Amino acid sequence: HKRRIPVYSVSSIFRRDQIFFKWYGGTYRNVLKDFDHLFVQNEASKRYLSKIGISRVTVVGDTRFDRVLQIREEAKDLPLVKMFKGDNAFTFVAGSSWGPDEDLFLEYFNSHPEMKLIIAPHVIDENHLVEIISKLKRPYVRYTRADEKNVLKVDCLIIDCFGLLSSIYRYGEVAYIGGGFGVGIHNTLEAAVYGIPVIFGPKYQKFMEAIRLLEAKGAYSIKDYDELKALLDRFQTDDVFMRETGANAGYYAVSYTHLT
């Protein structure tokens, strides 16, 4: 502001429990008042800001919807992943997973030989990869060590490199988004945009897109193994349910594009 350079906040979202709206949040409210304009995701954010005297606000939606649509349109062709999946296998893609997530879906995977699993853990250091491998009871291969021969002989593909997850979701029948048993879930839209059901843990409340996916019946939140098992059992045996859930997820992701 000393140099008279405009400052904007884009694709912001505000919640009632944030410090800006507390009686002791004056310093933080002053920071918001320094913005020339705030472009927010929803009407609720605009109302909260109005109550603290901030009126330079426009509701424009969430730019991430346009971004994930662009990512889908530019998705990489991954021949080894396609070969691993094969023609008929029910493939479960777990993205940005952490240990507590992995404990649940690996238990299910180990006891269900009819399915295949692609894991793209959030942390891909050697210690975490070894930890994942120690829990597996079925054949696996790391992506960086996969080839046209060994990828046909395994049931689990571990993505041990960055930059592929947003393209990999399209090879799954169902996606699991990690982080819901820790600080909060990761990006649900990257999976939903492919029109597949989305599953995540119980800590999703800070993410409006996750809440709306649940409301649209394009996603389901689970809190323990029994709930995950019941959901995956149904997805594998009720094709209509799986396709309708996926269609709901895809429609939600696409319906909010081009609003920014």
Where on the chain are the PLM-derived regions?
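A short, well-ordered alpha-helix in the C-terminal region of glycosyltransferases
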Residues: F241-V254
